[in-house]
UniProtKB/Swiss-Prot annotation:
Record's protein name: Cytochrome f
Species whose genome carries this gene: Angiopteris evecta (Mule's foot fern)
Membrane topology listed for this record: Single-pass membrane protein
Keyword Membrane in record: yes
Keyword vocabulary terms for this entry: Chloroplast, Electron transport, Heme, Iron, Membrane, Metal-binding, Photosynthesis, Plastid, Signal, Thylakoid, Transmembrane, Transmembrane helix, Transport
Subunit field text: The 4 large subunits of the cytochrome b6-f complex are cytochrome b6, subunit IV (17 kDa polypeptide, petD), cytochrome f and the Rieske protein, while the 4 small subunits are PetG, PetL, PetM and PetN. The complex functions as a dimer.
A GO cellular component annotation in the UniProt record: chloroplast thylakoid membrane
Lineage, highest ranks first: Eukaryota, Viridiplantae, Streptophyta, Embryophyta, Tracheophyta
Gene name in the database record: petA
Location(s) in or outside the cell: Plastid, Chloroplast thylakoid membrane
Amino acid sequence: MQNKNNYNWLKEWVIRSFLLLTLLTWPSVSNAYPIFAQQGYENPREATGRIVCANCHLAKKPVDIEVPQSVLPDTVFEAIVKIPYDMQVKQVLANGKKGGLNVGAVPILPQGFELAPSDRIPTEIKEKIGNLSFQNYSPDKKNIIIVGPVPGKKYSEIVFPILSPDPASNKESNFLKYPIYVGGNRGRGQIYPDGSRSNNTVYNASATGKVIKIFRKEKKGGYEITIEKTSDGRQVVDIVPPGPELIISEGEFLKVDQPLTNNPNVGGFGQGDAEIVLQDPLRIQGLLLFFASVVLAQIFLVLKKKQFEKVQLAEMNF
């Protein structure tokens, strides 16, 4: 028993050490995770309606969300976020190589709506969710859920299990029509939350002048481009990380901000919205009673008409 405990402790220590080493060695990869955006913004949706993910994912792409037209209180339902893209394309990874696109999404629900507890999620919804792991944007914002990055080929459609509020126990919610907002991205961003650029964007010349040298870094990849400034003859060196492809050559004259590389980005970010009605069960019952009364009234009207016709026929025979 003691040996088993020691083995489990050693296994956990190795895993934690590996994760820590990964974060320290490849910061550009760790920066892709939502936690870094969470640390920078108290609310992911600005007053203008813009979702802050667009600050890092600069290209605009479509996204869609599907929800039921209406739901009853204290009910689990599914919200489906669709993040379409060409499955054949490859993105530039942090090490400069090509790989599959990842996706992520952030639905912003009305106050009171939240991620459904695991024991409340129906089996058919669990099967659609797969191995996805969701988390709240912050402890005090349970109505904002985030997921990603996850493999896009498997999760271009993400199913979120949502629990509707019950106004009987939650006084902040009411039987109304509510908006739901969503942001979704495919591929890596162009700018990290700290303002630095990733290798998944265009790199531009920092000065006007002549390219006098292009040095390719064989070990780490990327380029050092030496530009002789036209204004004073001084030399500046622009660093291009591995990933983007050069579109300039030695001897070429450049203007400041002229692209040095292509744009390797094949992904992008999009926003969408939908509406959902938190339906009052009593209202539905009242509506059913109304329909029943209309049907009964029609039946009685038909019976009364037939009775009247019989009376008329009897009088004519008399």
